[in-house]
Amino acid sequence: MNQPKRNLKIWIPIAAVLCFWLGNWMGHTYELTEGTTTHRLAAALNLNSLLLHPFRLSADAFSLGCGIATALMAGLIYLCVKYSRHRLMPQKEYGSARWGGPEDIAPFQDENAQNNLPLTASESLSLSPKMKVTANDNYNRNKNVIVFGPSGSGKSYSVAGPQLLQFNSNYVLSDPKGELLQEYGNVLLSQGYKVKVFNLKDRDKSDHYNLFAYIKNEDDILVVTKNLVKNLKEDPIAKSTADPIWEEGMTALLEALIGYVFYELEPEERNMNSVMTLLLMLESQGDGPNSVSQLDLLFDDLSINKPNSFAAKQYKLYKMAPGKTAQSINVSLGLRMSAFNIPSIANICADDAIDLRELGSEKKVALFVVTPDTTTAYNFLAAVMFQQCFQILVDIADHRPDKRLPRHLRFLLDEFPNIGMIPDFQILISTIRSRDIACTLIYQSLNQLKSQYKDDWATIYENCDSMIVLGAGGNPENLEFFSKALGKATIEVMNTSENKGSQGSYTKSYQALGRELMTPEEIRTMPRNWCLLMISGVAPFYSRKYNLKDHPNYHLVEAEGGKPFDYDRRAEQSFADFISNVKDVKTVKLCAENNN
């Protein structure tokens, strides 16, 4: 692309004055010189004389006329050149796309490789929040990465693994089946990370997570309720075709229940088990139209004692539904919430030991969210946890003087569609950059992104300055999208013509044509160990995938990886950390009571 033209408004009058000065000087010199016309012209064109007497100017008519004529002539020449010039772009007539090289990625990389985010075998991105800014370019990019690759294309091996082994961030990972925990959990422990595990697959091994521990006010209640109602559906992604009164009624009821538990119960009772206890109190004490439930009586008392109660007001909204509609809402919400009746779920949600706030500290912390790959029944809890994580970390950053987390925080979201929907995620991903938070979103295909966030997928895509295509399967729509994203290049096509008659001739000519940098078919048949990388504002890269074994820290995977996560080792490490933080020890003498 041609460089933008400079503003000529200042230079045109300056050039006119200089031309007038030159013409005036030449005219005055011509008048002062005696001799033949040739001799006088030679004197007027003598540059040495111009340098010796630059201010030999005159206001007589001849000299003024020469000055004006010179300025006008220069103006005419400029206009002729300007309007007769062709806007040629040699070798770019049909497109200027090209492959990026080492010189293109160099300004985006940190000299210390440990401070980079690996993208491919040869390209990486500095995690520095302040990159170089020049007159021609700004090398700051957000650190969000979106990855597309079908099953078996190396999403964990070539992307998630290398990024984890940098040990330059705190991490929140979605981990289908728990493979990342098994491969890297002990590795992170060996590097001093505090490893937290929310395990929805093997729940007896999970740290406890109580969503009430991260609720501060009514705003948080609204956000959590919206998330639960959305993700407790059989298909959270599907657009509801039912009457909106059902979902709105469930939302109002659940807001009332959560609000009551949060504001009216003791801290140790604030959990989803208490919400389920209240929900079971909805059973009416009769079959008549005026029958009431124990929950009705409870909220009637609350309305009398605390008329401005948020929970009481939301319950009144729910009670505006007609009797049969309200009963249907009760049953629907009860069925959706039934997962909380499972003892193992009730147990891990009863209290909180996971302490999500610690992710925003200076400590080295990693959180693995393990989900089963054979069912999505419990993914709603993962969706709520991820949303609360985002909110908590943004809040921590906003209360710091520099408005940033003390340590870069990366969400490594493998198989991102499987955790359901995070409401307003398109807003979150566009605002977390300034807090030093970033996401690596991993999808099997572009269609997954479009299905997950139907109306907002483009916003999410555009807020990821880096895109890695590990493979595109055979979907023509996906292949066409990536081909167009790479752009078109201008190539030369050779045409030959041969005449074998008595006056035989042979001609050869070249013609410029446009061609995709990679056609859809070329992307489909791309070798398995190669990938495409596109960084905003930079020529795309056709590079080898990152081979995890080439990482400088891979020896740690060989030593620690592939083994079941060592919970005992984690407990010992946590105890050692506790002891190291003890600042004062006092001895207390206990005396047994003498009953004699």
Predicted features along the sequence, with ranges:
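Sequence-pattern detector for short linear motifs
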Residues: 9-12, 101, 518, 547, ...
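Short alpha-helical interface patches
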Residues: 47-53, 64-119, 218-228, 274-285, ...
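Basic- and hydrophobic-enriched, low-structure N-terminal and domain-boundary segments
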Residues: 1-153, 157-162, 499
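Conserved ATP-driven motor cores of ASCE-family P-loop NTPases powering translocation/secretion/packaging/pilus
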Residues: 429-431, 435-532
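P-loop NTPase motor domains
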Residues: 141-437, 452-453, 462, 521-545, ...
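A broad, low-specificity signal for short, low-complexity segments enriched in glycine/proline
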Residues: 102-111, 121-137, 157-158, 326-332, ...
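A short glycine-/small-residue-rich loop at the edge of a beta-strand within enzyme catalytic domains
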Residues: 111-115, 380, 416, 473
